[in-house]
Swiss-Prot record:
Purpose of the protein: May be a regulator of keratinocyte proliferation or differentiation.
UniProt name for this protein: Coiled-coil alpha-helical rod protein 1
Superkingdom assignment: Eukaryota
Disordered, as annotated region: 1-23, 189-214
Gene Ontology process terms (BP): cell differentiation; protein export from nucleus
Length: 427
């Protein structure tokens, strides 16, 4: 611009140079010694722009240096142009330094905000870690409770199976012993009847020659046979009556056999059911407490969100960057809160599922208790049936024993009469 305008004469006067060094402004100490690459590019471009001007000035001075009249004026003109360019360059550098200072201040504020944001995020992550740890501990507790309930259920099943097998084994042993005793009694009675028949046949064969003496004995034997047939008919009638009585006893007699064992088992099952119901009530109470916690956290988060929104309202309309960052921070805070609420809801649903599963186990145990009660009633009825059958067999054996004693008494009388008849014949 100096080459196109007129230059006043005072511009060519000699100016004294300052002897004291210039002091740097106080804001220069805040500028870092190492400039960013962008600033170095700006200085290099400025130095490149100055180089062609200095080269042109040297060419003009060398071209016009031969003229003696223009030499002094051209030197002063070139010096003034160089000074004006240096002043303009210094002003540009000062503007650039002020701009760099403003950028440094903005970067410091940004780094401070980022530091505060990182601290808040670290606190949020720590709170989330504590919540996750608490949720894991609660899940482990529920898994332990379910494992305990499963162990109790398996123990109940094993105990019921062992008791049922023991009852069946005892019933089978008792039935086999009763059958064996009945067979032994029948074989002994058959053997005794065979012996009696043999003794009667031998007596008839030996006394066949004495018809008169043995006629009475034959009549008595015939009478004995008739009595035996009548006894057999009476025995069959008694067996029929015993069968009817057994059926009547199986229908009318109340269950009293092994009642104490089944009552203790029933009491144990009722205690187990009561304990599971108490566990269910405890889990229900825990679910209600978790619901209260969720509501409290929701209320607290709403209050904190309102307070945060009130604090981050922009006081100056010339700060859109700060407002945008605050809005982004508020948005992230809402996302974290939503994730925490989703996690709490998932824990609540899982807890509810565990409670429903425990309810199903309690219902299954109650149904099994009822089924075992019905099986117990059936076994009691069958035991009563077997007891009545044993009693009938005992009565049958007693009747047969009485008949046998009567037959032996008749035989003894017949032998006595035979002996008396022999003595009379000898006389």
């Amino acid at each position: 611009s100096g080459s196109t305008r007129l230059i006043p004469p005072s511009h060519f006067q000699a100016r004294p140079h300052p002897t004291l060094p210039r002091m740097a402004p106080p804001w220069v100490s805040d500028i870092p010694l190492v400039q960013p690459p962008a600033h170095q590019d700006v200085l290099e471009r400025l130095s490149d722009n100055q180089r062609p001007q200095v080269t042109m000035w040297e060419k003009e001075v060398s071209g016009k240096g031969q003229e003696p009249g223009w030499r002094g004026r051209s030197v002063e003109l070139a010096g003034s142009q160089a000074l004006s360019q240096q002043a303009e360059l210094i002003s540009r550098q000062l503007q650039e330094l002020r701009r760099l200072e403003e950028e440094v201040r903005v970067l410091r504020e940004t780094s401070l905000q980022q530091k505060m944001r990182l601290e808040s995020q670290a606190m949020e992550l720590e709170a989330l870690a504590r919540a996750e740890k608490a949720g894991r501990a609660e899940a482990e507790g529920l898994r332990a409770a379910l494992a305990g309930a499963e162990v109790v259920r398996k123990n109940l099943e094993e105990g019921s199976q062992r008791e049922l097998e023991e009852v069946q084994r005892l019933h089978q042993e008792e039935l086999s012993s009763l059958t064996q005793a009945h067979q032994e009694a029948l074989s002994s009675l058959t053997h005794k009847a065979g012996g009696l028949e043999k003794s009667l046949s031998s007596l008839e064969t030996r006394r066949s020659e004495e018809a008169k003496e043995l006629a009475a004995a034959q009549r008595e034997a015939e009478l004995l046979r008739q009595q035996l047939s009548k006894t057999q008919e009476a025995l069959e009638a008694q067996v029929t009556l015993a069968e009817n009585l057994r059926r009547y006893v199986g229908e009318q007699v109340p269950p009293e056999v092994h009642s104490q064992t089944w009552e203790s088992e029933r009491q144990e099952l009722l205690e187990t059911v009561q304990q599971l119901q108490e566990d269910r009530d405890g889990l229900h109470t825990t679910a209600e407490l978790l619901q209260v916690r969720v509501q409290s956290l929701t209320h607290i988060l709403c209050i904190q969100e309102e307070e945060l929104a009130r604090k981050v309202q922009p006081s100056d309309c010339l700060e859109p960057e700060f407002t945008r960052k605050c809005q982004a921070l508020l948005k992230r805070w809402r996302e974290k809160v939503f994730a925490l609420m989703v996690q709490l809801k998932a824990q609540e649903l899982e807890h509810r599922g565990c409670v429903e599963q425990l309810k199903g186990q309690v219902a299954e145990l109650q149904e099994r208790a009822e089924t075992q009660g019905q099986e117990r009633a059936i076994l009691e009825r069958s035991l009563q049936d077997k007891a009545a059958e044993v009693e009938v067999e005992r009565m049958s054996a007693k009747a047969l024993q009485i008949e046998l004693s009567r037959a032996q008494e008749a035989r003894r009388r017949r032998q006595q009469q035979t002996a008396e008849a022999e003595e009379q014949l000898k006389l």
